Amino acid sequence: VQPSLGKESAAMKFERQHMDSTVATSSSPTYCNQMMKRRNMTQGQCKPVNTFVHESLADVHAVCSQENVKCKNGKSNCYKSHSALHITDCRLKGNAKYPNCDYQTSQHQKHIIVACEGNPFVPVHFDATV
């Protein structure tokens, strides 16, 4: 049973929107269309861009103790992964309109930058890939 989105913590939202440790890579071109829908990012509108990380939750949590960097918004609670991780970028295609959210799926190996907070200190926001 998934918790209602209203009671979702920032850490739980991060997991829902960005974690997919079940697959090492997303070879299917329809991966983003399926996952964006399954993870509730196409309700009411199409989320324009989203990144899924194909690593264990423990490995992504560990980024919070790696290199401290500035976030895009100027805050100082972002952390960059030491190594490149398997990720999938989902980008809304230019002509796609809600409710027909149609995404381009692209796979990469990149360093991720996440914002971390709380106790335990865990990712709550996906900031960037480099």
Swiss-Prot record:
Organism the protein comes from: Cricetulus griseus
Its biological purpose: Endonuclease that catalyzes the cleavage of RNA on the 3' side of pyrimidine nucleotides. Acts on single-stranded and double-stranded RNA.
GO annotation terms (biological process): defense response to Gram-positive bacterium
Organs and tissues of expression: Pancreas.
KW Disulfide bond (keyword) present: yes
A Pfam family recorded for this sequence: RnaseA
SUPFAM superfamilies referenced in this protein's UniProt entry, alphabetically: RNase A-like
Disulfide bond entries: 32-90, 46-101, 64-116, 71-78
Residues binding substrate, per UniProt: 13, 16, 47-51, 72, 91
Protein name: Ribonuclease pancreatic
GO cellular component: extracellular region
Annotated gene: RNASE1
